[in-house]
Amino acid sequence: MELALNEDGRSWVRTRAWVEGQLAPGERIVAAERLRGGWTSEMRRLRVEGPGTGRDLVLRSFVLPFFLEHADGLLTREADVLDLLGPTTVPTAGLVAVDSTGAHCDHPSLLMTLLPGTVRLDDGPDADHRAELLASQLAAIHRTAADGRRRPRGYQAWTAPDRVRVPEHTTRPELWRRAVHVLRQAPPPYTGRFLHRDFHPGNVLFSGEGPGLRISGVVDWVETSWGPADLDVAHCSTALALLHGAPAGLRFPDRYRAAGGELAPSAGARRHWRLLDALAFAPDAEKVAVPWRELGRTDLTPAVLTTRLEDYVAGVLARP
């Protein structure tokens, strides 16, 4: 299988040599397939075969200028998290090797094992069951112990009052004014928890059907942080609202609490974290929409996503 160039013409000669240097004697790469559904990095499934054996690995490489600048921190963080979570019940990939600076590869890269399962974003009959499993999995992630040097960095907010991009043709400007006003208040105090920080259906793999449906993998740990559990819950809530409609997002915090998770005691604090996340998606959630459309959700047009986001923000503001 020729891996010298990818579809954009970038060289992968050094990366391939580095990957093969991590393999067992006699193993070699025989095929590569681009994995879709992400936008921050290029992901490839690599088929590796050796004498009487075969296995699949996943290669993450940062190639875009912004992420090249931050690749060292992102990939080092993910490598540390995979190592931390390895002995736990959280279904994560196993770390094989990392070149966080691109010293040996064409681009900064991380090599890991392949997890079973697929991303499922459809509006099918098991969407509610998937949401329950997401809530249970997120509560388990938040119970991860990470003290001292193993504790990740503090969370970073992904928007601010003056950075919110209000939809150009909104018919509800007062809704956005009220939402932005909430963000102008100081962040509420919180009890720190181990956060995935980008937990949503696009970063979770499912296996099985019906009663046998289960989560078989949680991926993309480059943003792992220490912060309020509400922020992770808010992020998944916003994503569910965009994928399935505002009610799905508004129900998720209750599912999380039913699964044993703990949220901020005051309604005002919970509202702050949910709006801090939701307003980062304005005006039309394009960053997640592109990979979601690649995975089959072509119905998620900018107009649909803007309407769902506004409906969700209205629901958050209306909740006591």
Question: PLM features: residue spans?
Answer:
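An alpha-helical support segment within catalytic cores of ATP-dependent transferases
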Residues: 10-26, 127, 140-197, 201-213, ...
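Conserved N-terminal boundary motif of the eukaryotic protein kinase catalytic domain
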Residues: 26-33
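Short, flexible/disordered intra-domain loops and linkers
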Residues: 3-4, 65-73, 289-301
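Active-site activation/catalytic loop segments of kinase-like enzymes and analogous catalytic loops
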Residues: 231-262, 276-294
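Actinobacteria-biased recognition of intrinsically disordered, low-complexity terminal regions
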Residues: 1-9
